[in-house]
Amino acid sequence: MENARPIRRALLSVSDKTGIVEFARALQQRGVELLSTGGTARLLADAGLAVTEVSDYTGFPEMMDGRVKTLHPKVHGGILGRRNTDDAIMTQHGIKPIDLVAVNLYPFAATVANPDCALEDAIENIDIGGPTMVRSAAKNHKDVTIVVNAKDYTRVLAEMDANANSLTYTTRFDLAIAAFEHTAAYDGMIANYFGTKVPTYGVQDEASADSKFPRTINFQFIKKQDMRYGENSHQAAAFYVEADVKEASVSTATQLQGKALSYNNIADTDAALECVKEFAEPACVIVKHANPCGVALGNDILEAYNRAYQTDPTSAFGGIIAFNRELDAATAEAIVSRQFVEVIIAPVVSEEAKAVVAKKANVRLLECGQWQGKANGFDVKRVNGGLLVQDRDQGMVTLTDLKVVTKRQPTEQELKDLLFCWKVGKFVKSNAIVYAKDSMTIGVGAGQMSRVYSAKIAGIKAADEGLEVKGSVMASDAFFPFRDGIDAAAEAGITCVIQPGGSMRDQEVIDAADEHGMAMVFTNMRHFRH
């Protein structure tokens, strides 16, 4: 057997006590002696298990309200002692070998996530003895097994049963890696939290408020998938996800069928899903190369899909389709019978819809679960030698936020379309222009270096598909620096505009809208997307 080590003595000390009684009982049934500390020891004893308190084993009591429990040579000597090398000195000092350590750490992240958390609470939830034992056991994985995740209890027991109560080196090494990842993430959380207590850079006042952004920033992501290649075929790639993410997302979605998701599939699906989350009504978003090419609302998702597809059938070919309602069979049939699609994602997929999509085996079908709003957090962009870190763009406007700046007031329908259009524009690459009518996009101008050309492209798109622009509204993700964008929109038939405002030439732009009889509202909020 491959460098197997028998498990005869285990030290159990956990904050997350999920499954620990069952694990301890199973170990004891296999003849393993149990050592434990504090609350874990009491829990095991109350469950009728024979357990030795670490303080009884070391002859040294827990002290300082539990701050010092396991920091003792008889504990760490038992973990770090090299079998067949340190045996004599261990015997000389009465140190018993500890073969398995099951430890997880004080709930620091949960503590500091509480908005009422005081600095003292955070400090008392910094684990000292736990990480020390974890690192000691992981360092000595040649002889010792470390378990930091309750999900591994079953794995350990199964291998013990298969190997006469022993564990292989491969398993010990794998668990040691998990342990180092665990302590790295834990220390990163602590550094991130205390890093926000440093005075904001550039502010000399020592009493300045805490910074939202720590002095150093630590992230930990877990590899979910190796990919055939990245954005291009000559680039290697993998997909990493955050641990314990609760928000419905492409990262947490379950793939029901189809080929493995590609790098570009994941990026585009994220864009489509985040856009469709903006809407309360049944909605469909079709994305191509990270830009919405068709977005619409409907009485149901079939109507929403048909209308979104109508915006730009050419670009929808090979696109990503996202819904904010259950995917039903009728909608699935409409999609697969009409177009080539890379990915379909919805909160739920009916059994009937699964059967329909199964006829197209290569279509990637994802189920992401329902969502309750969007979580706050950071957006990160990599630049050469650095990271740009900012809040997620959660900004949105309501009717009460709109400021009418023209002589003509928007109609009730125009106001409804303006808010729809504004939500879509948030997800279009800058410079972004969106034309919409009756809660349906009719033209999207994305990613142009001049705003007027984005406006012209939106009009061209609508004309190419035979969509009537007259009476439509336009959203711009940033202000118009000149009146030319308004003139182009008016020529296409736009009657109402929503934009942030804030240009030195705002009055010139407003005058242009008045000349054309258009209504215009300012949001005082920009939605650049690069």
UniProtKB/Swiss-Prot annotation:
Record's keyword annotation contains Chaperone: no
Q: What is this protein called?
A: Bifunctional purine biosynthesis protein PurH
UniProt KW keywords: Hydrolase, Multifunctional enzyme, Purine biosynthesis, Transferase
* Catalytic activity, as annotated: (6R)-10-formyltetrahydrofolate + 5-amino-1-(5-phospho-beta-D-ribosyl)imidazole-4-carboxamide = 5-formamido-1-(5-phospho-D-ribosyl)imidazole-4-carboxamide + (6S)-5,6,7,8-tetrahydrofolate; IMP + H2O = 5-formamido-1-(5-phospho-D-ribosyl)imidazole-4-carboxamide
Q: What HAMAP family does its record include?
A: PurH
Question: Its family?
Answer: Belongs to the PurH family.
What GO biological process term is on the record, naming one? 'de novo' IMP biosynthetic process
Domain of life the protein comes from: Bacteria
| PROSITE patterns in alphabetical order | MGS
